[in-house]
Amino acid sequence: MVLLYSQASWDKRSKADALVLPFWMKNVKAQEAAVVDEDYKLVYQNALQNFSGKKGEAVFLFGNDKTKEQKIVLLGLGKSEEVSGTAILDAYAHVTTVLRKAKCKTVNILLPTISQLRFSVEEFLTNLAAGVLSLNYNYPTYHKVDASLPLLEKVTVLGIVPKVGDKIFRKEESLFEGVYLTRDLVNTNADEVTPEKLAAVAKGLAGEFASLDVKILDRKAILKEKMGLLAAVAKGSAVEPRFIVLDYQGKPKSKDRTVLIGKGVTFDSGGLDLKPGKAMITMKEDMAGAATVLGIFSALASLELPINVTGIIPATENAIGSAAYKMGDVYVGMSGLSVEIGSTDAEGRLILADAITYALKYCAPTRIIDFATLTGAMVVSLGEAVAGFFANNDVLARDLAEAASETGEALWRMPLVEKYDRALHSDIADMKNIGSNRAGSITAALFLQRFLEDNPVAWAHLDIAGTAYHEKEELPYPKYATGFGVRCLIYYMNKFLSK
């Protein structure tokens, strides 16, 4: 995928379907953010009477026989002294939708005068590229006649030399290949994206990148490893489970290793603790954690980061069948810890628990970060714009929070309240898999923390239940799967681990 290009010269730019011109907001009036020819000023001067230049505001105009582009969009960037990376990201995501609705395929984007900004050219271009790439995406559909909006095919950013701009753009395009992979997997039918399909995608990545190795465990191997919790969840489905291990060696001589774990419930009916129909209809997205890990590995290998990372995906359906696991029964995980099943709809934490144990036994992790659409309680707490995360290590928490801030993928640290751990007490097992009807996200995280046992490994748990999938377009994300987490984690690993 090559979409974005750089061109230093305004005069030498190629003809395009549309031109995007930047404006600042100055005393509730629009102010030009870059110098343009008088021919263009004549086109938009009347429109400025009703255009303030506020953040994300876009006005669509038509050119004339003296303009190289026949469609012109005035894009507001807000007040120059207040503009942020996230505002730039959202603005260019929004204008991408405007351009696609106008059926534009080629676009020229004029950069504002960067000297007026509080941040670097690189940061501006990175956020511009991320905005364009984020909404230049179509989710899979099954219409007889495809009604999707046309995609932009070439976007040229004017005012930056290719040596600088193209390097940034190639990096963002590699990153978004991973984001798109995550989105496509989450958006596709659960009958297609089975545990075996996730394993096939992992194998495909290992075939594409020499730096990746993959290991797949089937049901027999899962049982041999005594992963009793994953095996229990898988009992009710005719679809075979898989336990997927991806390994990336970017710095072979280093002992530092990050383990990423992604919940891979490819469809969640709730099991015998059956979900209501309205709650079940989007449950193909319950493997978004697994898809996030696969997307990260796609980007990681493409960008060739000098770090070591292992990805673990416990993958299964949570279905109803004659052999389905039952509430009140006790199952023993790979760790040897026993769990009383208080709800078969609290299955995600069970399969993550076995994955954590596997990581501790075989991977010698420096840190473990897991991703899961784990609790509805997190959606109630933080909605769809922010993912909650828990961490047992302040440095890891601080670095993840910075990565989230820099990429616009909002994270909020939640507390691991020790006294709530008692809600997991069981009279007949080491613990229950569900607490009371309060603080559900916290007790879920405390459940996972138990499986670290006495290991001092740094750990973070990202509950992406609200952020992984949106019922409507919310800038800078498209409708449905968002790919949330891929950009944040790549930024985190690139800045804090690539040393």
Swiss-Prot record:
Q: Which reaction does it catalyse?
A: Release of an N-terminal amino acid, Xaa-|-Yaa-, in which Xaa is preferably Leu, but may be other amino acids including Pro although not Arg or Lys, and Yaa may be Pro. Amino acid amides and methyl esters are also readily hydrolyzed, but rates on arylamides are exceedingly low; Release of an N-terminal amino acid, preferentially leucine, but not glutamic or aspartic acids
Q: What is its main location?
A: cytoplasm
- The entry's Mn(2+) 2-binding residues are K263, D268, D286, E347
Q: Which Gene3D superfamilies match?
A: Leucine Aminopeptidase, subunit E, domain 1, Zn peptidases
SUPFAM superfamilies noted in UniProt: Macro domain-like (SSF52949), Zn-dependent exopeptidases (SSF53187)
* A single MF term (Gene Ontology): metalloaminopeptidase activity
User: Under what name is this protein listed?
Assistant: Probable cytosol aminopeptidase
